[in-house]
Amino acid sequence: MQGVRITILWCIVLATIYAEEGPSTPRDDDPVIQKVRGLRNAGMKANDERMFKDAIEKLRHAISLLHNRVFGEERAAIKDPTVISQDAALYAQILNDYGSVLIRTKQYDEAIEVLEDSVAMIEKIYGDSHPSLGLSLRSLADAYMEKKAFKSAIKRYKTLRKHVKKGLGMTHEAYIEASLKIAEGYKKLNKKDTSRKVLKDTLKAQGGEINGLTIGIAELYMELSSAHVEVGEIDDALRAAETASAIFLQREGKDTMAYAFSLNALAGVKMQQKKVDEAIDLLDRAHNIAVSIYGENDRITLASAKTLQDVKDHKMNLLAAKDEL
């Protein structure tokens, strides 16, 4: 769910990049550029339809055509510096698209190589303040994360966060999402104290009045609750879990899986407090939401039913043990 929101956010950023291209120019009528854009659009459509082999083939063709214009024999025929810059920018953009498809097909090494090139080209063309740099950095960091190269992923997410901070500020959802990824990376490296510090510092950076409707804030509290539980800070975990649940309720609504997941997390804290009845009530509410959305036999619903039953069984065992005393 979080991953979907991140994707939507960066799609908006990408739309901004397209909008900056401005009005039609003679270059737009160039047959090579038209063919490249057609291949790019067809490739991304195939990607959306999970036809990855077709998507890769079309994007590789587009890259090959543009590579010849940017680096090959056709470069000598192009004299206008603006056109040269636009060609290079389009090349970097399609490299990013191609890298994203490679990530989806788990071809991480090639994805990283392609996306490193995309980042380098954008920095050379625009410097470190262009929106398209953030898009490529995010894709590159994601590729490292998927490859389980967590140190490299953290480094790139930090660069991305610095880029976002400079352009959008620390209260923007993109800054929060990058911070969540950094914290996740440290958690994967078993650096739990560092992960928790990243989460707390990000929350502190939001200032005195936190906007709970900002995407990422509820998720931030949820992760912070989990981090507190891991080190036995149960009171802090409860406060964070309650805040996350309240925000999800306000932001997503009472009949959503986001809210249901927050109830599950809150139930976990209640179990740490040995408040089993309260945990059962929360899990029952979460399960009913899942049933209303997916029905009785969905994988998610069956999992929530099992969790609920396990806790009920735990309660019965506690009662039985008490009766034996």
From Swiss-Prot:
Taxonomy, superkingdom: Eukaryota
Subcellular location: Secreted; Host cytoplasm; Host nucleus; Host nucleus, Host nucleolus
Pfam families, per the entry: TPR_10 (PF13374), TPR_12 (PF13424)
Induction: Expression is up-regulated during plant colonization, 3 days after infection.
Cellular component aspect of the GO annotation: extracellular region; host cell cytoplasm; host cell nucleolus
Domain-level remarks: The RxLR-dEER motif acts to carry the protein into the host cell cytoplasm through binding to cell surface phosphatidylinositol-3-phosphate.
Family, similarity comment: Belongs to the RxLR effector family.
Annotated protein name in UniProt: Secreted RxLR effector protein RXLR-C07
Record lineage: Eukaryota, Sar, Stramenopiles, Oomycota, Peronosporales
